[in-house]
Every structure is written in structure tokens, then in C-alpha cells.
């Protein structure tokens, strides 16, 4: 269940959104957080955008990510911040032709893939460094 947060609040036996879905969390500390789900979800306490033939969902997702800080600034409420669909209305988005939306989304998705590979490599390198530090700084492995 997606309930206004960066992580699923809990799991639900059924879904109310099928196919790919963009969510914008509606309340709480993560109000305004934008996410894309590729599997069926049970969405609650969030605005959702589903796939359509009139726009590229990945493009919409990247548009929203690009405006993430603006969306956060649109929060209302005090101790319990909220973002409602009407709060997003003043935020301007540009939509080129569908083929261009698709091309832009493909480039950005490919870059995300490259970044994920680099992030994995970075984590592996960090783990290797930690292991080397343990070996070298404890004296188990000597260099001279």
C-alpha cells in the first residue's frame, strides 16, 4: 500500500491501481514526494497519474521530478503538511509532442540506468576500501 510516503506503509492483498502509476504523496513528512511504480499498487493518501495514450508516463514522471522542490514548497498545513491536486494546478509543465516526450523519457531512463550501475560500483568500491582498511590498519596485512 502506498500511503503518503517514500516507502509502502504496509502491504495490501489487492490493488486499486493497475499498470504503471505515478504517485504524489498527499500528507505527512513526505507530502509531495513523487514516485513511479511499475507494478499494481493499492494507492491511498496520494494523487495518482496512470498511463494514457495522450502522454508518456515516464515523461510526466521526469517533469514532476524536475519540479520536486516546487511541489514541496506548495505544501499547506502546519504540523501535518498536505499536498492536494489543486495545490499542483499553479505549477506549469511543458508538454512537447508525444514522440518527443517518449524520446526525452528514453534518454533520461537510460541515464538513470547508467547512474544505477555507477552507484553499484561505488558501493562495491566502498566495501572493498573498508575491507582493505580493516586489513591494513589492524596489521593483518603488511605492505613492507
Regions found by a protein language model. Name each.
Residues 3-65, 72, 76-77, 84, ...:
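A short beta-sheet element
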Amino acid at each position: 500500500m502506498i500511503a503518503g510516503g517514500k516507502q509502502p506503509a504496509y502491504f495490501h492483498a489487492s490493488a486499486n491501481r493497475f499498470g504503471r502509476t505515478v504517485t504524489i504523496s498527499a500528507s505527512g513528512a513526505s507530502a509531495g514526494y513523487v514516485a513511479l511504480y511499475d507494478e499494481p499498487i493499492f494507492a491511498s493518501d496520494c494523487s495518482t497519474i496512470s498511463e494514457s495514450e495522450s502522454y508518456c508516463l515516464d515523461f510526466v514522471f521526469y517533469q514532476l521530478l524536475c519540479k520536486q522542490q516546487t511541489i514541496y514548497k506548495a505544501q499547506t498545513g502546519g504540523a501535518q503538511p498536505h499536498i492536494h491536486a489543486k495545490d499542483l494546478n499553479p505549477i506549469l509543465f511543458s508538454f512537447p509532442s508525444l514522440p518527443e516526450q517518449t524520446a526525452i523519457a528514453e534518454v533520461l531512463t537510460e541515464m538513470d540506468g547508467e547512474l544505477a550501475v555507477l552507484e553499484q560500483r561505488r558501493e562495491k568500491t566502498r566495501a572493498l576500501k573498508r575491507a582493505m582498511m580493516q586489513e591494513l590498519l589492524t596489521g593483518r596485512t603488511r605492505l613492507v
